[in-house]
């Protein structure tokens, strides 16, 4: 959360028609006498084995009655798992609900695609999430309006719309509370029916309860927004002690606060690590859950703060104080009710290694990760890298991003003020920065007015955004009229000078299609002078949003963006409705959320891992591709699960590399002849394509061929079309090679060749000409279990010492040393130890600009290992495992067996680690059962690389490792 000081009247909403109107999610087919308007399920999420009800709303707009079979088919990925037929009769001009039931599978955490076929009346689609825990796949929405005028039926309707049409399964209740330190207002121990919040909005307690009940009817989760460290003005009267506070000076004369600019409203900040504050505010969290029946707490904060102190004058490192607070809060909530202890925390301004990001994502016991993105991760690739880091840090917890699309842009149909109907005003050009041919001046007296005539292309919400200047020294006001009806008095805040233009005054209305008049008038109650530049119908840009949502989902994250009344987040203050969605974007969002629900297992599961992003894996004929979201390219993103290889194609052609700003319609791609290189040990048995942009996400089987060329083994297929985002998933089996030995000559090769002119190689040859920048060999390996493994690269080197960088699943894993072996016919191993989850992984040995030397590469051997470190000494290792020693100094591992028999020395080689205590390693073994390994170390303090046992320093301690 960023706090922005906004007068309440900036955030206004006019409801002219019922807000629960639902738009069709189906697609009409002009060649048929009707269409399926929508297909939806009765809940947002289902428990394993729970009964699922699917409803298809079918319209018969033809001139005759229709009678026929309606078929529902449920798919898990490419496989149909259930089918049912209902006979229906629909009178001409009528819409009928056809209902199906299915008892969900007892397997937890699975997504399903639902297809309904009504023959000549068309097809419709939906999805089903079978998950016992929403936090596994959080599709997070929000509620920010709690009006006392909202009935229980209206509360249910707006919740049901988000659950049924957009598959939202959790809701953040934004700014629902009375005060930040006293969330529920009571008088004499009784809860008040309403209260006034921080921004002077009325909050209705019955409405909050109705909304939570509606969410629970959808099997959704209601999360109470709360700050981690905030209390309002006069907090002492509510039981808060100033000694718990954070201060700007050691003498605690100035407490950290947020001033809301009206000389009466403040938010004061408190130390999250202070035990008194924790005890107090955790009780408030518990009260919110137990009294309102929330399911958990959404904890917010306001970003980086430096040079702060506690009451006693001690300097505070705020970034390290969130995790202890979260752990204590979680413990308290769990002790009270483990079914209502969900928790997430906002990592503000998220970026790789950003402020507080690593500590919270690694150590805080939140149920899913949540991060508000500002300006440290502006590009697609920066954001993907950040998502990757959060998932890696947390053991693949779910990630939700608060990323405000088109932030700060004044976009949509624009009407220039100088072209409007003017009364008692003038047009001028004497202040720079206006749009059009000028601006309206002398808008300063009673009876002055500007009347715009606008066109609404469709029925729906429209955001009226006024661009103005005001340097009169105070806030000016004008009355707004829509179609001659008074709506509201709007403020126009004072600006630094008359050349500063603002578009932060807005008002949202619901309009019918056609022409409307929008009038700003200086009436007798108004004050101040303004210059008026334009009126914009603030509108979200569909192209950038579809691309950004595609990128986030393909990277393994979801996006909080949808709220009540089909609103989308325009701002960090959620009630801000300065932009609206048009129907085409709403339809695209329905398809997107249906897609990410149906295919959640290929997008968000913990065993979905990155493949290397290098171009050596993908070739699309005649298409400019990139592995990193470069501007004007088709971005290819490869992933894999234990059963599938996955290729995401995101169409950035005609767009730049940044996700937030408005964009362009991507240049459509058709018939993409695609070649995907695979490991020699992989077998592909099916290729499938699915996209939210086509057939509302239905899977299509693609014909494919297999082959081998100079680069390696591949499959080839044609992707019929690419609009924004297509996902190709390939069913795969893997046969691990004998002794886990992966031959280099059959791997994926980049700018190298295969040769047999030096004896001693294994397999059918070795990789030659591995000698210049961007040469590489890429392996796909299979780990039989989750373990540490030594990557053992067998090579020969008849020249100078060499090294190569190693990339594991697309991330730098270290550098392997490939020293001179004494000749090209003499082979040795260079090693690097890495952790591997069970399943397939990409291992790339690459010549980067920082590397040197020429080598021949024979094979990669994958050996399980245990790691011995001075701070983590192990006493035993299973038979068959190697032992990797890691240290922070060069030297040798001096070892023998069974009381120092068969003594050997193995050099500790630099591994490229950034950890200076673990940046050298060597492995030994494996050893048979009933063996004792004796180990010590000889340190090369003079760093000459020569073992000098009378000169180099001995460790002085012997260590024993048992092999049971």
Curated annotation (Swiss-Prot):
Enzyme Commission code: 2.4.1.248
Gene Ontology MF, one: carbohydrate binding
Keywords associated with the record: Glycosyltransferase, Repeat, Signal, Transferase
EC class (word): transferase
Organism domain of life: Bacteria
CBM6 domain residues: 413-538, 740-863
Signal peptide: 1-30
Catalytic reaction annotation: cyclizes part of a (1->6)-alpha-D-glucan chain by formation of a (1->6)-alpha-D-glucosidic bond
Tagged with keyword ATP-binding: no
Keyword presence, Signal: yes
Entries under Pfam families matching the protein: CARDB, CBM_35, CBM_6, Glyco_hydro_66
Family: Belongs to the glycosyl hydrolase 66 family.
Listed PANTHER family: HYDROLASE, PUTATIVE (AFU_ORTHOLOGUE AFUA_1G03140)-RELATED (PTHR43863), MALTASE-GLUCOAMYLASE (PTHR43863:SF2)
The protein's role, per its UniProt record: Produces cycloisomaltooligosaccharide from dextran.
Name this polypeptide is given: Cycloisomaltooligosaccharide glucanotransferase
Gene: cit
């Amino acid at each position: 959360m960023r706090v922005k000081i906004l007068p309440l009247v900036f955030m206004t909403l006019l409801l002219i028609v019922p807000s629960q109107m639902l738009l069709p999610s189906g697609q009409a087919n002009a060649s048929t006498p009707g269409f399926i308007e929508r297909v939806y399920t009765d809940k947002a999420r289902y428990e394993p084995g729970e009964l699922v009800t699917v409803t298809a709303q079918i319209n018969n707009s033809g001139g005759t009655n229709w009678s026929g079979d309606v078929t529902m088919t449920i798919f898990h990925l490419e496989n149909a798992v259930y089918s049912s037929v209902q006979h229906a009769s629909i009178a001409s001009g009528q819409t009928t609900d056809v209902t199906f039931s299915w008892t969900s599978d007892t397997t937890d955490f699975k997504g399903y695609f639902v297809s309904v076929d009504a023959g000549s009346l068309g097809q419709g689609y939906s999805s089903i999430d079978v998950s016992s825990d929403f936090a596994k796949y959080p599709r997070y929405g929000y509620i920010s309006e709690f009006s006392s005028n909202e009935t229980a039926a209206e509360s249910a309707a707006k919740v049901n719309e988000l659950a049924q049409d957009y598959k939202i399964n959790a809701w953040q209740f934004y700014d629902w509370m009375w005060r930040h330190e006293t969330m529920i207002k009571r008088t004499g121990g009784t809860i008040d029916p309403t209260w006034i919040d921080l921004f002077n909005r009325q909050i209705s307690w019955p409405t909050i309860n109705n909304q939570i009940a509606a969410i629970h009817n959808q099997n959704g989760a209601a999360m109470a927004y709360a700050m981690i460290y905030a209390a309002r003005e006069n907090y002492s009267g509510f039981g808060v002690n100033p000694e718990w506070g954070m201060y700007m000076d050691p003498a605690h004369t100035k407490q950290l606060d947020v001033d809301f600019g009206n000389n009466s409203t403040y938010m004061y900040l408190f130390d999250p690590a202070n035990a008194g504050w924790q005890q107090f505010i955790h009780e408030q969290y518990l009260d919110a859950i137990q009294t309102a029946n929330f399911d958990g707490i959404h904890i917010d904060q306001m970003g980086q703060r430096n040079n702060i102190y506690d009451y006693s004058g001690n300097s505070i490192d705020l970034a390290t104080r969130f995790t202890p607070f979260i752990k204590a809060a979680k413990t308290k909530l769990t002790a009270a009710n483990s079914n209502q202890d969900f928790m997430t925390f906002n990592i503000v301004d998220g970026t790789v290694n950003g402020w507080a990001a690593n500590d919270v994502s690694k150590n805080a016991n939140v149920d899913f990760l949540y991060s508000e993105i500002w300006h440290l991760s502006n590009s697609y690739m920066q954001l993907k890298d950040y998502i990757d880091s959060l998932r890696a840090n947390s053991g693949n917890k779910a990630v939700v991003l608060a990323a405000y699309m088109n932030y700060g842009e004044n976009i949509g149909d624009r009407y220039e003020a100088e072209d409007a109907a003017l009364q008692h005003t003038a047009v001028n050009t004497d202040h720079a920065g206006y749009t059009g041919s000028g601006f309206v001046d002398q808008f300063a007296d009673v009876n002055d007015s500007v009347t715009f005539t606008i066109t609404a292309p469709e029925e729906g919400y429209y955001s009226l955004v006024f661009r103005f200047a005001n340097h009169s020294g105070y806030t000016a006001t004008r009355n707004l009229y829509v179609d001659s009806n008074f709506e509201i008095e709007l403020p126009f805040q004072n600006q630094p000078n008359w050349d500063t233009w603002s578009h932060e005054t807005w008002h949202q209305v619901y309009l019918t299609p056609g022409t409307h008049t929008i009038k700003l008038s200086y009436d007798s109650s108004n004050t101040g002078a303004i210059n008026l530049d334009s009126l914009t119908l603030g509108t979200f840009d569909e192209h950038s949003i579809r691309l950004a949502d595609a990128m986030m989902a393909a990277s393994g994250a979801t996006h909080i963006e949808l709220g009540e009344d089909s609103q989308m987040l325009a701002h960090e203050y959620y009630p801000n409705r300065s932009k609206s969605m048009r129907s085409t974007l709403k339809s695209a969002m329905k398809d997107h959320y249906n897609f990410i629900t149906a295919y959640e297992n290929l997008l968000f599961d913990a065993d979905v891992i990155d493949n290397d992003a290098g171009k050596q894996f993908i070739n699309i004929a005649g298409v400019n591709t990139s592995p990193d979201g470069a501007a004007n390219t088709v971005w290819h993103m490869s992933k894999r699960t234990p059963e599938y290889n996955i290729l995401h194609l995101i169409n950035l052609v005609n767009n730049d590399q940044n996700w937030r700003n408005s964009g362009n319609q991507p240049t459509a791609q058709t018939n993409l002849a695609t070649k995907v290189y695979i490991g020699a040990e992989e077998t592909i048995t099916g290729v499938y394509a699915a996209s939210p942009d086509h057939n509302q996400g239905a899977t299509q089987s693609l014909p494919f061929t297999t082959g081998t060329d100079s680069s390696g083994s591949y499959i080839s297929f044609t992707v019929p079309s690419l609009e924004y985002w297509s996902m190709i998933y390939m069913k795969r089996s893997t046969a691990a090679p004998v002794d886990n030995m992966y031959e280099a000559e059959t791997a994926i090769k980049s700018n190298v060749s295969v040769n047999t002119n030096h004896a001693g190689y294994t397999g059918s040859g070795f990789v030659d000409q591995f000698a210049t920048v961007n040469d590489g060999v890429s392996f796909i390996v299979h780990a039989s279990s989750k373990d540490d493994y030594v990557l053992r690269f067998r090579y020969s080197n008849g020249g100078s010492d060499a090294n190569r960088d190693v990339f594991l699943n697309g991330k730098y894993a270290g550098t392997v040393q490939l020293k001179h072996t004494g000749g090209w016919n003499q082979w040795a191993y260079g090693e690097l130890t890495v952790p591997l989850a069970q399943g397939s992984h990409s291992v790339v040995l690459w010549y980067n600009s920082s590397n040197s030397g020429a080598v021949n590469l024979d094979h990669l051997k994958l050996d399980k290992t245990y790691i011995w470190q001075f701070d983590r000494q192990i006493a035993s290792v299973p038979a068959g495992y190697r032992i990797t020693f890691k240290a922070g100094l060069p030297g040798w591992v001096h070892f023998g067996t069974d009381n120092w028999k068969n003594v050997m020395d193995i050099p500790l080689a630099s591994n490229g680690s950034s950890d200076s205590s673990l940046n050298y390693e060597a492995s030994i073994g494996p050893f048979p059962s009933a063996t004792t390994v004796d180990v010590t170390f000889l340190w090369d303090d003079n760093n000459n690389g020569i073992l000098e046992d009378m000169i180099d320093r001995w460790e002085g301690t012997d260590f024993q490792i048992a092999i049971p």
